[in-house]
Amino acid sequence: MLIIETLPLLRQHIRRLRLEGKRIALVPTMGNLHDGHMKLVDEAQDRADVVVASIFVNPMQFDRPDDLARYPRTLQEDCEKLNKRKVDIIFTPSPDQIYPQGTEGQTYVEVPGLSTMLEGASRPGHFRGVSTIVSKLFNLVQPDIACFGEKDFQQLQLIRKMVADMGYDIEIVGVPIVRAKDGLALSSRNGYLTAEQRKIAPGLYKVMSELGEKLQAGERDLEEMIAIAGQELNEKGFRPDDIQIRDADTLFELTDASKRVVILMSAWLGQARLIDNKIIELS
């Protein structure tokens, strides 16, 4: 396993792999790795000869400085986990390597519409930061495929559109959400939960699942269904942030033609902002 911190060294190894005809997979992460990330690695290994995992806490996608400052950084433990998974290359650049002139004057990539709706509306600049760093990593690693978790559903859709619009010859693989036994979606931010909050946290998935059952049963008063779900979250101890029911293919509001629906939920529990989603196939 190679640990690479600089762009020139990464380019050198990528050139060698390309000359050898290797199929390269990229797994972009911000570190603090858990079983959900390992699922991405497993998927990448099944589909490629070489796996490159990046660990970079991207300052450009944080809308609050305090959130960036407290984001968990566990590089040594992350490298140990990736080594056990036999990842070929770990790319761990510093912010100075990625943004040598800082983020303010950085050329950026922005996906219109998807960057500013839903999650993007409440986190200005977040998705611009995501699309910019992912585009940079694509240019540096030159992967044949890249694996992303479906937990960040809007992010996945945004990256797919960026790849299509920019003409990247990269297969984007969405990997299903990995959940704890009680249903809580695995997330690096779950570490912000206290022991008591961790007991409450699966309630988000429970409320979302009940909402999905109503949709499958034919209920269509979305405004009332969302209001009830928000009330249920409040009663469980959450502070609801956003609940949306959207077309899973476009992320726009439902139409009569919508066949795949995604429920998108976010809620605060103490200092942790939890997000989750569920795909519903309508008959």
Swiss-Prot record:
Subcellular location: Cytoplasm
Keyword Cytoplasm tagged: yes
Molecular function GO terms recorded: ATP binding; pantoate-beta-alanine ligase activity
Listed CDD domains: PanC (cd00560)
UniProt keyword annotations, A-Z: ATP-binding, Cytoplasm, Ligase, Nucleotide-binding, Pantothenate biosynthesis
Pfam short name (any one): Pantoate_ligase
Positions that bind ATP: 30-37, 149-152, 178, 186-189
Keyword ATP-binding: yes
GO cellular component: cytosol
Catalytic residues as annotated in Swiss-Prot or TrEMBL: 37
Pathway: Cofactor biosynthesis; (R)-pantothenate biosynthesis; (R)-pantothenate from (R)-pantoate and beta-alanine: step 1/1
Enzyme class: ligase
Subunit structure: Homodimer.
Note in the entry: The reaction proceeds by a bi uni uni bi ping pong mechanism.
Name of the protein: Pantothenate synthetase
Provenance organism: Salmonella arizonae (strain ATCC BAA-731 / CDC346-86 / RSK2980)
